[in-house]
Amino acid sequence: MIKEKIIFGIDRKEISHFTSIELQQTINIHHTFAIKVPHSVIEKPRAYTMENAQNWLGKVVHIQLENKNNFLGIITNIELDFNLDHVGSQIILTGFSKTILLESGTKMHSWEDTTLQDMVREVIKSGANEQLQNEIQPEFTHKINYQTQYEETDFQYIQRLAKQYNEWLFYDGEKLFFGKPKNIREKERIALTFGQDLYTFKLGVKAKQTQFGAFTYNEDYNKLYKVQTQNKVEGLPRLGDQTFEASEKLYNTTSLEYGRIPTGDEGFLETILKKRQEAAMADANYITATSGNNKLKIGSIITINAKEEIEVNSAHRLGLDATKTNFQTQEVGTYIITEITHKATDIGEYENSFKALPAFIKTLPEAQVAFPQAQNQQAIVIDNADPKGQGRIRVKMQWQQTKNLRTQWIR
């Protein structure tokens, strides 16, 4: 579909021509892009090496698909593609969203009595300085007694925290969100009509394991807490509720595992498991589609409509002019986009394909990231005067000794 001009620039300078752009955006992970630029845009004719293009490596790329739909990324790879066909030789630029700034190597760090918000903000500031816009507003606001970043990159650690506490995590093209955006329900809804700007459309449901059980041990009070999820998930549409019921019958036993985070009471553990259940069911009802609307991006709220021609007899009954073609519109549902791929060409062609979930789900699907596995480590005991008289100690691991860090009270 021919759309308004797509603007593409590098290091704050607009590039006059491009051959094609492909941008893949998904919640919980880095976005990726591939841009083809004619060889002649920056290199001399008959140049068989890079004389200028290599200077783009590590630079910020800006793609403006529409006035309010921008993408900022980092170029991490450049190739010269020599070709004798009608397209000619190309410079191929590939890279990631600016979240890639948080992948500068695995790290080890620890925090005591700190909120999730403060931890994530500190990690982003340390890894990306002021280069990555962010909005960090997690629902979990309690102080956390002790938390460790353990042989994880900054982004892997943020992914793991999002999974551990079932917080929203996504990059909207310009800003990284950790926690559900406060104005998500007030966002402008974008209407898409099947047969107009919505080219193909699939609606699906899938059975999911929905019943979770967990236990934790509170060593301060020598008490074991054990809970399991209930048979209700909020925020699902009719199809989601029916999918939940079918899933319960299919997977009719409850899992049991050690709680992902330490809790002080059963009510707290129940809340955490409820959010995990919401995350599991978030994509049980979904849609996939292709569209020509270049306003769409991760986090967009869309309303899907189906437009049908009204038969002549029905037009008469409705008091419509039967000599004209009349249409009626039926609303299919309201959704939030969680995956989208944009494709554009230099002649103004544009199309996207996307996946979307029911708009009012409470929690996004979990990030697919593994929890770190701890190993035996050497440590120095720095305190054995347990204020609660329970025989606990504090230690410094070797990696904590240069950072003035320490563990919590441990046995």
Predicted regions and their residues:
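Amphipathic alpha-helical and helix-coil boundary elements used as assembly
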Residues: M1-R411
